[in-house]
């Protein structure tokens, strides 16, 4: 089981599926997971899984060691702008379609380590 604190920004179809799978398989403990989504319905879904609900994107980053960025491409810059100050020393995984690691680093001044994942649906 992963003991680091994991943050998920975006709990829609992809982010939610990854999170749910990790929780159900026992890879992640719900008390170590922080979630934020701009859609209240997605937050309600995450609440049902027993994870910690964050107040906003920055709150996710402040409380997490590793962050999964799972937002729509058009929402990435706004989410990262909110997180910028809380990303120092963190690692980030991104499943944001069409947004390169270089672009993500430019949005946040290149502070955290970023890994880009390409899930196949």
Q: What residue spans do the PLM features occupy?
A:
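NAD(P)+-binding Rossmann beta1-loop-alpha1 motif at the extreme N-terminus of oxidoreductases
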Residues: 1-55, 59
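Rossmann-like NAD(P)(H) cofactor-binding subdomain of soluble oxidoreductases
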Residues: 49, 57-62, 66-121
């Amino acid at each position: 089981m992963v003991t680091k604190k994991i943050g998920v920004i975006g709990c829609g179809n992809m982010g939610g599926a990854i999170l749910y799978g990790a929780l159900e398989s026992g890879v992640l403990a719900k008390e170590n997971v922080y979630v934020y989504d701009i859609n209240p319905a997605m937050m309600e879904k995450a609440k049902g899984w027993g994870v910690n609900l964050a107040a906003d994107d920055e709150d996710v980053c402040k409380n997490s060691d590793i962050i999964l960025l799972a937002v729509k491409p058009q929402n990435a810059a706004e989410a990262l702008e909110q997180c910028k100050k809380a990303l120092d020393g963190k690692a980030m995984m991104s499943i944001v379609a069409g947004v390169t690691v270089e672009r993500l680093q430019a949005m946040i001044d290149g502070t955290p380590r970023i890994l880009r994942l390409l899930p196949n649906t």
